[in-house]
């Protein structure tokens, strides 16, 4: 059973989004996603300063099972990346919602956050996938 924090927003591709309250968000992959991937061995991080649209690829996460592209859930400018993942990619497995964050984004449209799933809707999505 995956852990799903109530204070986050989610995507149907299993990314989480934390509203930092200042027009920026922190983004990572969910507990469900890291469980499905298995042991993460590499995270390809984007360059800061890049402006991307929602749905664009921003990186790659590789595990012992597979490599998966990471897609931006919201449009904006990448303002920070979690460089500690370069030396310790397993942090995504150990602590996906805190130390395992991947990027921080300055939102192009802060109201777009409302279009993402809340914890209840994401829990229903995960439950449906597990059935």
UniProtKB/Swiss-Prot annotation:
Species this chain originates from: Chromohalobacter salexigens (strain ATCC BAA-138 / DSM 3043 / CIP 106854 / NCIMB 13768 / 1H11)
Pfam families in UniProt: GCV_H
GO biological process: glycine decarboxylation via glycine cleavage system
GO-annotated cellular components: cytosol; glycine cleavage complex
Domain Lipoyl-binding: 24-106
Subunit structure: The glycine cleavage system is composed of four proteins: P, T, L and H.
Entry's family note: Belongs to the GcvH family.
Domain of life: Bacteria
Cofactor: (R)-lipoate
Record note on cofactor: Binds 1 lipoyl cofactor covalently.
InterPro entries: 2-oxoA_DH_lipoyl-BS (IPR003016), Biotin_lipoyl (IPR000089), GCV_H (IPR002930), GCV_H/Fam206 (IPR033753), GCV_H_sub (IPR017453), Single_hybrid_motif (IPR011053)
Name of the protein described by the UniProt record: Glycine cleavage system H protein
């Amino acid at each position: 059973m995956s852990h799903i924090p109530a204070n986050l927003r989610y995507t149907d591709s299993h990314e989480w989004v934390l509203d930092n309250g200042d027009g920026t968000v922190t983004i990572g992959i969910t507990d469900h996603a890291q469980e499905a991937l298995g042991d993460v061995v590499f995270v390809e991080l984007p360059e800061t300063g890049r402006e991307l649209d929602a749905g664009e690829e921003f990186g790659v996460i590789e595990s012992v099972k597979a490599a998966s592209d990471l897609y931006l859930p919201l449009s904006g400018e990448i303002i920070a990346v979690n460089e500690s993942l370069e030396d310790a990619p397993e942090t995504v497995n150990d602590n996906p919602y805190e130390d395992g964050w991947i990027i921080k984004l300055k939102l192009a449209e802060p109201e777009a956050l409302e279009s993402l799933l809340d914890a209840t809707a994401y829990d229903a999505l995960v439950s449906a996938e597990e059935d």
